[in-house]
Amino acid sequence: MSYFDYGYFKYSNKNIKKFDPKKERTKLSDKRGIINRIKANEFDKEFYDGDRINGYGGFKYDGRWKVFLKKIIHKYKLNKNSKVLDIGCKKGFFLKDLQDMIPGISIYGLEDHKYPIKNSMKEIKSHIEFIESFTSINFKKKHFDFVHAHNSIYIYNLRDIIKIIKKIEHISKRSHITIPAYITDTERLKFLKWTLTGTTILNEDEWKKMFKYIGYKGDYYFSGAKSFGL
């Protein structure tokens, strides 16, 4: 188990300055209320492609995963014979870029909301499966060479997150989880003010203790207030 930052948030913060600077995110944090959180937690059009105050404000493909998939491919030694699962794949952007970079690789996506699947990329849609809950994931032991879960499981409660991480450990040879965390109370409050869908937010030491306790041996990255530029 190791901490691995493949650069997603560094790239995102650098390339979205022109339309979503830190001060704009702070303004959104100040404006977001319970109705915005209700709309966001439907994980429907309003969250993905509606107003920015309710979610992404337009979840569109931009090819950004190709920038840091190079690191992922190298670290996890992925090739055309590999099987890769993306948990919480949304519209399939990670899978699309991975397929483009390694033609012939076996890609699988699981998504627990129907809107992003319906609006996923046509060349990827057949590779995405709807699942009511990631706690129901059911594959054979070490079925996948690599399992990826990018900020997709923290919307669950702690008990379910433990179930999901145990399943990730069971079905993967190697894995990487990105999950929100904080160090200081100030970071925690900033993130809670910003997030629309966050349910389980622990500090970094708590996540590490939990990983060790449940036997998770995969890699991880902690996102949070600093990652989002708050």
What are these regions (language model features)?
Residues 81:
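Phosphate-coordination loops involved in phosphoryl transfer and adenosine-cofactor binding
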Residues 145, 173:
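Conserved acidic residues
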Residues 1-76, 85-139, 156-167, 174-230:
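Class I (Rossmann-like) S-adenosyl-L-methionine-dependent methyltransferase catalytic domain
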Residues 148:
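A conserved beta-strand element that flanks and buttresses the S-adenosyl-L-methionine
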Residues 151-155:
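Short catalytic micro-motifs in class I SAM-dependent methyltransferases
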